[in-house]
């Protein structure tokens, strides 16, 4: 409730309009029975046509007023709930942009998607009901009780007796739905995760002819979700039929016990009709309140899941007031860096790493799988923070930089190229929105992407499917490199970014890259020796430690690990074509 209110209170004008229309709704709904009683007692029973017409026109006017009030209420609630969920999702997404890789790993991407969509929608539904009935219900209930007591105090006990039966139903449903709601959202997380993995890995599934197996697994996951949903629907479905039966029993009891007052004239027929209407509205208010109570457990679960996102401690401090500019550009130094992934401090993946890189230099990293190459370069843009030691960029500790300013200095090209839905031009301008067409042309030419771009009718306006799925792996990789070239950073980081390219394209691309990286620091993580032979310095990693450094020729003579890697590739084109 407090989480929802923190957003709704930002719009006092809409809340005031909502309150006004809710009060109008209550006045109309409780005014109609009173007018109906007057029509019966003053118009129908004495057969006074003039009074009947008078009260008829009054009723017609109030009904019109009620229609206007209902329209205003729906409009105000619609504005409040849609604006609330918009702001809520914007805040959640902004918070996610502050997350480091560690926070994403803690919660899981599929769960985050579920929370941004399904959980936010649950809160929107509850806010809709609360704004419509949260004000109407107490006003209606209090007003109905007062009218019941003033109309026929002797029959009021019947309504009072009905309330505990309703309360028991509400309590039972509320207690039972909370754990089921918690399980429901977790099950939905698993279902979304399974669907996401399978849709992403569709080609692998088909390649191994595992469609039937995956269908069975999905059906099993879906069955768990459906079973839990059925349990929830059965519980919440109890409320309305039980309430209806209790209300019917109450009306029958009122009519039965009203026979004597009607017979002795102490109660008029019109007043009896009005009393039944007031009693109906009193219990209907309780029904609305019950619906809010049955919705609340699931809303509380969704609210907690969203607050987890907002309250998650950020392991990477963005340092908004940090350094934004430096006199030099591209100087990089690792000073005795040790790194362990969060929660795994006993098992560091990097030990005592120290090296320097200057603008114009190319530093390469090579080693066996799991030696820490990618972990090392991910520390520079602070995807993770070092455990011990420090990393300096232009003489400043990366933790002392404004995080955005630090990342502006870096062009990071991951092994798995990620492109966004949109045009090729939009993707290339991702790091520099005002890049000219000439800059795009140059970057495409350098990255060896120009040929396949030119082969498409719309060239840079070619639309890319989700994740660039309408391109080959090599084409996506070249566009990823071109995107970094357009950005023109101080430090280029190629995290095994040439692996999807053939050897000839790899060699040509690296040769052309020198045209734009002459004043920048270039770091290359690679598996191919041929990719890094021309580097100014090659650093050999083994089990997170530096076990060798030097040029290709120096390492071939002095470092056994490097020599083994190189010799294993001697028969491949990686060395012969260089």
Placement of each model-derived feature along the sequence:
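An intracellular "coupling" helix at the cytosolic face of ABC transporter transmembrane type-1 domains
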Residues: 9-12, 77, 98-102, 118-131, ...
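Helix-loop-helix
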Residues: 48-51, 143, 147-161, 231-305, ...
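Helix-loop junctions and hydrophobic alpha-helical segments within the transmembrane domains
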Residues: 92, 96, 205, 306, ...
